[in-house]
Swiss-Prot record:
Coiled coil: none annotated. A motif (Cysteine switch) lies at residues 97-104. SMART domains: FN2 (SM00059), HX (SM00120), ZnMc (SM00235). The gene is MMP2. PROSITE patterns: CYSTEINE_SWITCH (PS00546), FN2_1 (PS00023), FN2_2 (PS51092), HEMOPEXIN (PS00024), HEMOPEXIN_2 (PS51642), ZINC_PROTEASE (PS00142). This is 72 kDa type IV collagenase. Produced by normal skin fibroblasts.
Length: 663
């Protein structure tokens, strides 16, 4: 580790003292206030702001009584226990990324249940995000409109000039409509209800990283895969890369593979960079010309000077003052998000509090977010930004906002597109709740095939979408049941329910992806490892391991890496038995015993379930071992078996709905 030798003022002396103190005690980096970062709020401050913005609690008069009453409304909306208290689950919900429209009626957004009085709606894209190329943005918006035109008579036509019914733009913080954004995460976008003027307009926060939901979308130039997309992670010379790299080159240009294995396929292209091309402007895509002159000053890199929107640009000739030729600088593979660097790329290595960092770090933060400096020394320049993550799906967020632009309000159904909290869904389908809502406004799409109606005469067949399950209205066969961090979770498709009381009614449904992103929409089994309190999920022939809500690096992995034979293509259930701390994995009529300490399967297995677990059926749905209870529970269809751990005897057979779900 290296520190600067010259420190001209008190702050830098303080940095040395902090550095020496940390080195002596081997303590973690101190938490600091980053310039341009939003000030962390107390739970009470967060709640007052949240309830004011989304539930109408008066900002200056949200006293304890009003706060408690409004909190109950918010908790009811999200399927949480209606305590009126600021418990951990409520705070976690408030911190999740979401739409900026309110959850209760707000006449600035939705006056008098508005709708368009015509079926042909125009839209215009005024501005673009630098996170995606224009073609990808155009396609995302077109697909988002198609979500609604597929189930209604509405038809959407794009225009390039003049006033459209729906004007689409990106902006930061205060962007001209009186409803400012809030920086990275938090509030993602908002839209106004149908009507003249600002009615229908949809705005997206450009401090977010806009992707298609699975990380940066990088379209390459040149190479032998021109126009294709980077595939992250990819392998090159036996090493895994999660972003563009200059490895193997001596010209400094960043590149990526467009397949998972460059060593095998040899497909590559160059990642966006201002030395290769620019976007927009009037420079016809020409690369930046460095240095270039602007207002008499010389610039040797992209700048935001002369602009109020924070977008980086450059001259495409050596003299902008003379030629007036310019373009916007494309986001590079390591462009920062948020912070105060205006999208400038990370610079590695960089110095922070005297230490050298060769990659993104969470040092100095208490929220775990990864960041980097955009110069070689944060200590000198204090320029920084967040490192790219999975980002937010522009298609999904736009489809939600365009629902508002059609007149829909937020839905309490967590499986609905119109639910306020953002959740990435890989294979998206419009829910029945969304379809019902939009068709109440605009009737059924004329393209829907006619069929028998509810009355004696013919009528349109309603469009069907996935329905969110209700515990006591449907006989649910659960995909998995597990105790994780002291709570019992019940999983069904992409939904879950949770409770701390084994005999109390669980809260939910909640979307699994809001807690454990990157899982498939249906799991086969789940358990918590007692060694490290990691949650382990199984689906098909793979498994996922999570620390809290973060997927561990290198996952998912194949079942064979656990020691299961290749013929096991899925498992039925898994649990860790408190009696011996071993994990038992069930598939069909067999089970395996896994040693968590040694991280290996025990040689004595597999065995037949019937030979060791008297009375336990084959093809289980789930197994739950309750901590310190002395019992294990086996779930099959609508019933469960309670086994006493000490005697291995089944002591009870009961109905899941009445004994576990409070029905």
């Amino acid at each position: 580790m290296k520190t600067h030798s010259v420190f001209g003022f008190f702050f830098k002396v303080l940095l040395i003292q902090v550095y020496l103190f940390n080195k002596t005690l081997a303590a973690p980096s101190p938490i600091i206030k980053f310039p341009g970062d939003s000030t962390p709020k107390t739970d009470k401050e967060l709640a007052v702001q949240y309830l004011n913005k989304y539930y109408g609690c008066p900002k200056d008069n949200c006293n304890l009584f009003v706060l408690k009453d409004t909190l109950k409304k918010m908790q009811k909306f999200f399927g949480l226990p209606e305590t009126g208290d600021l418990d951990q689950n409520t705070i976690e919900t408030m911190k999740k990324p979401r739409c900026g429209n309110p959850d209760v009626a707000n006449y600035n957004f939705f006056p008098r249940k508005p709708k368009w009085e015509k079926n042909h709606i125009t839209y215009r894209i005024i501005g673009y995000t630098p996170d995606l190329d224009p073609e990808t943005v155009d396609d995302a918006f077109a697909r988002a409109f198609k979500v609604w035109s597929d189930v209604t008579p509405l038809r959407f036509n794009r225009i390039n000039d003049g006033e459209a019914d729906i004007m689409i733009n990106f902006g930061r913080w205060e962007h001209g409509d009186g409803y400012p954004f809030d920086g990275k995460d938090g509030l993602l976008a908002h839209a106004f209800a149908p009507g003249p003027g600002i009615g229908g307009d949809s705005h997206f926060d450009d401090d977010e990283l806009w992707t298609l939901g699975e990380g940066q979308v990088v379209r390459v130039k040149y190479g032998n895969a021109d126009g294709e997309y980077c595939k992250f992670p990819f392998w090159f010379n036996g090493k895994e890369y999660n972003s563009c790299t200059d490895a193997g080159r001596n010209d400094g240009f960043l590149w990526c593979s467009t397949t998972k294995d460059f060593d095998a396929d040899g497909k590559y292209g160059f990642c966006p960079h201002e030395s290769l091309f620019t976007m927009g402007g009037n420079g016809d895509g020409q690369p930046c010309k460095f240095p270039f002159k602007f207002q008499g000053q010389s610039y040797d890199q992209c700048t935001t000077e002369g602009r109020t929107d924070g977008y980086r640009w450059c001259g495409t000739t050596e003299d902008y003052d003379r030629d007036k030729k310019y373009g916007f600088c494309p986001e590079t593979a390591m462009s920062t998000v948020g912070g105060n660097s205006e999208g400038a790329p990370c610079v590695f290595p960089f110095i922070f509090l005297g230490n050298k960092y060769d990659s993104c770090t969470s040092a100095g933060r208490n929220d775990g977010k990864l960041w980097c400096a955009s110069t070689s020394s944060y200590d000198d320049d204090r320029k920084w930004g967040f490192c790219p993550d999975q980002g937010y799906s522009l298609f999904l967020v736009a489809a939600h906002e365009f629902g508002h632009a059609m007149g829909l309000e937020h839905s309490e159904d967590p499986g609905a597109l119109m639910a306020p909290i953002y959740t990435y869904t890989k294979n998206f389908r419009l829910s029945q709740d969304d379809i019902k809502g939009i068709q109440e406004l605009y009737e059924v799409s004329p393209d829907v095939e006619p069929g028998p109606g509810p009355g004696p005469g013919p009528g349109p067949r309603p469009t069907l979408g996935p329905v969110t399950p209700e515990l006591c209205k449907h006989d649910i066969v659960f995909d998995g049941v597990a105790q994780i961090r002291g709570e019992i979770f019940f999983f069904k498709d992409r939904f879950m329910w949770r409770t701390v009381n084994p005999r109390g009614k669980p809260t939910g449904p909640l979307l699994v992806a809001t807690f454990w992103p990157d899982l498939p929409e249906k799991i086969d089994a789940v358990y918590e490892s007692p060694q490290d309190e990691k949650a382990v999920f199984f689906a098909g022939n793979e498994y996922w391991v999570y620390t809290a809500s973060n997927l561990d690096r290198g996952y998912p992995k194949k079942l064979t890496s656990l020691g299961l034979p290749p013929d096991v293509q899925r498992i039925d259930a898994a649990f860790n038995w408190g009696r011996n701390k071993k994990t038992y994995i069930f598939s069909g009529d067999r089970y395996w015993k896994y040693n968590e300490e040694k991280k290996k399967m025990e040689l004595a297995t597999p065995k037949f379930i019937a030979d060791s677990w008297n009375g336990v059926p084959d093809n289980l749905d789930a197994v739950l071992g309750l901590t310190d209870s002395g019992y294990t529970y086996f779930f099959k269809d609508q019933y469960y078996l309670q086994m006493e751990d000490k005697s291995l005897k089944i002591v009870k057979i009961g109905k899941i709905s009445s004994d576990w779900l409070g029905c």
